[in-house]
């Protein structure tokens, strides 16, 4: 199962942070997927410019550290990947989660 906009009540930065997708088996999160748009790599006016970029980096670090502390594998997909590359990397990631004893 995939759960879009998944939240963990204890993962917060001012408010509860949303993860783009959680992969679940038997209602247990076995992996997280985050799609990182351009605003994750450089300031974009639409997303708050420099201040928004700094906050995005803080939220990304909180999410990274949260998953690491909970032993939840996380896949970050940069906006620079093509659709075909994204399909391939998600497929490989899913296989690694479901065949590595995580399921």
How would you describe each model-predicted region?
Residues 1-103:
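Nucleic-acid endo/exonuclease domains
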């Amino acid at each position: 199962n995939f759960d879009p906009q998944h939240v963990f009540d204890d993962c917060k930065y001012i408010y509860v942070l949303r993860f783009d997708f959680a992969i679940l088996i038997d209602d247990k999160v076995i992996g997280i997927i985050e799609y990182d748009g351009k605003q994750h790599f450089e300031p974009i006016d639409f997303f708050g410019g420099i201040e928004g970029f700094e906050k995005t980096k803080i939220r990304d670090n909180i999410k990274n550290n949260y998953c690491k502390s909970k032993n939840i594998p996380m896949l970050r997909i940069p906006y620079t990947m093509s659709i075909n590359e994204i399909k391939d990397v998600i497929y490989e990631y899913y296989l690694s989660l479901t065949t590595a004893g995580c399921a």
